[in-house]
């Protein structure tokens, strides 16, 4: 099978589950729907390949799954440490005001005054809500190669995030340059 261009890293195999070839997957997201619904997973161990996911369920915060061709506990243990990737196109559909974090990374961020703040470099969760990590472009006049890149941390909540336009690749926020 041809490797899809839209693969997203969603977790890793942390070990075997039981004796019958099931694997335990530690998802990188609290929402493991993509792992539960995608029929094909891409693993990087022993070499990069696709595998059919036959059955899966949530178990104590992890996902446990039965994969085609993984016949017993030893075969499942041999996959320990393998990363799991799924095509973005296989993720479950979301409602209009819901977003997968992977879709926000790379979007430009500007404030209500039209000032460009930077680009979303990552997302993180502080327990209360998600946070946009926005990489601020370094000023051209900065000549110090050791200067640390600037970063804004903007809560991804309705109070600060006004619009997310995935088509225009832009997020508009109520956030000042001096916050």
UniProtKB/Swiss-Prot annotation:
Q: What GO molecular functions are on record for this protein?
A: ribosome binding
Q: Which family does it belong to?
A: Belongs to the RimM family.
Instruction: State what protein this is by name.
Output: Ribosome maturation factor RimM
Q: Which GO terms describe its biological process?
A: ribosomal small subunit biogenesis; rRNA processing
Mind listing the UniProt keywords for this protein, alphabetically?
Answer: Chaperone, Cytoplasm, Ribosome biogenesis, rRNA processing
Q: Which GO terms describe its cellular component?
A: cytoplasm; ribosome
Q: Where in the cell is it found?
A: Cytoplasm
**Gene encoding the protein:** rimM
Its function, per the record, reads:
An accessory protein needed during the final step in the assembly of 30S ribosomal subunit, possibly for assembly of the head region. Essential for efficient processing of 16S rRNA. May be needed both before and after RbfA during the maturation of 16S rRNA. It has affinity for free ribosomal 30S subunits but not for 70S ribosomes.
PRC barrel domain: which residues?
Answer: 96-179
UniProt comment concerning the protein's domains: The PRC barrel domain binds ribosomal protein uS19.
Q: Which organism is it from?
A: Janthinobacterium sp. (strain Marseille) (Minibacterium massiliensis)
Subunit structure, per the record? Binds ribosomal protein uS19.
The cross-references to InterPro entries, in alphabetical order and at most eight, read: PRC_barrel-like_sf (IPR011033), PRC_RimM (IPR056792), RimM (IPR011961), RimM_N (IPR002676), RimM_N_sf (IPR036976), Transl_B-barrel_sf (IPR009000)
């Amino acid at each position: 099978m041809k490797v899809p261009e839209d693969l997203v890293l969603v977790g890793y195999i942390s070990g075997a589950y039981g004796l019958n070839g099931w694997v335990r997957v530690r998802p990188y997201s609290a929402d493991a729907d993509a792992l539960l619904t995608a029929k094909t997973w891409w693993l990087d161990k022993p070499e990069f390949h696709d595998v059919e996911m036959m059955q899966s369920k949530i178990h104590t915060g992890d996902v446990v799954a039965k994969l085609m061709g993984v016949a017993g506990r030893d075969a499942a243990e041999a996959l320990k440490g393998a990363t799991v990737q799924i095509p973005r196109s296989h993720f479950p559909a979301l409602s209009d005001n819901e977003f997968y974090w992977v879709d926000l990374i790379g979007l430009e961020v500007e404030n209500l005054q039209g000032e460009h703040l930077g680009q979303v470099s990552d997302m993180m969760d502080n327990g209360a809500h998600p946070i946009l990590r926005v990489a601020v472009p370094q000023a051209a006049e900065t000549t110090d190669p050791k200067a640390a890149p600037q970063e804004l941390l903007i809560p991804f909540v309705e109070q600060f995030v006004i619009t997310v336009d995935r088509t225009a690749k832009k997020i508009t926020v109520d956030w000042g340059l001096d916050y």
